[in-house]
Amino acid sequence: MDIDPYKEFGASVELLSFLPSDFFPSIRDLLDTASALYREALESPEHCSPHHTALRQAILCWGELMNLATWVGGNLEDPASRELVVSYVNVNMGLKLRQILWFHISCLTFGRETVLEYLVSFGVWIRTPTAYRPPNAPILSTLPENAVVRRRGRSPRRRTPSPRRRRSQSPRRRRSQSRGSQC
């Protein structure tokens, strides 16, 4: 079965694959972030959003994976075999979970549309030859301010007219006073 965990959120494994593996924070940092920002919602018996549900599931999967790793570490006698298992878990499964955790935490923090815009912007940036692209990659936290990709159905932001300068009222008064004195 080929299951894409991002499909229902409008993204895909392919879209996230444009981000390099060292882009994603460590599992520990992601778990700390999720706990600091969303602990109450994650521990709540009530349904908050599909992102909260996916985040709960990813956290539970990571916990079970750590239980398995602990069991393997305690039951595998051969240090070389143990190292192979730990390495496989960290490289393959760890990366997938880091991607999933990052995606859902980012969607909850910045909004799904902003994260999708970021993934598209980064994908375009990374595939553009170095000579033709800006030196710095797009940054998620600044994307809403200078996004090239516009949301559908949203009109571009209009500029606010600059405030008119107020003229001093005193010259008018003087004129009217001087005219009044002439008459």
From Swiss-Prot:
Residues 149-177 have a biased composition (Basic residues). InterPro entries: Hepatitis_core, Viral_capsid_core_dom_sf_HBV. Self assembles to form an icosahedral capsid. Most capsids appear to be large particles with an icosahedral symmetry of T=4 and consist of 240 copies of capsid protein, though a fraction forms smaller T=3 particles consisting of 180 capsid proteins. Entering capsids are transported along microtubules to the nucleus. Phosphorylation of the capsid is thought to induce exposure of nuclear localization signal in the C-terminal portion of the capsid protein that allows binding to the nuclear pore complex via the importin (karyopherin-) alpha and beta. This is Capsid protein. Residues 143-183 are annotated as: Disordered. Belongs to the orthohepadnavirus core antigen family. It comes from Hepatitis B virus genotype B2 subtype adw (isolate China/patient4/1996). Residues 155-177 are annotated as: 3 X 8 AA repeats of S-P-R-R-R-[PR]-S-Q. One of its GO terms (biological process) is viral penetration into host nucleus. Phosphorylated by host SRPK1, SRPK2, and maybe protein kinase C or GAPDH. Phosphorylation is critical for pregenomic RNA packaging. Protein kinase C phosphorylation is stimulated by HBx protein and may play a role in transport of the viral genome to the nucleus at the late step during the viral replication cycle. Transmembrane segments: none annotated. Residues 177-183 are annotated as: RNA binding.
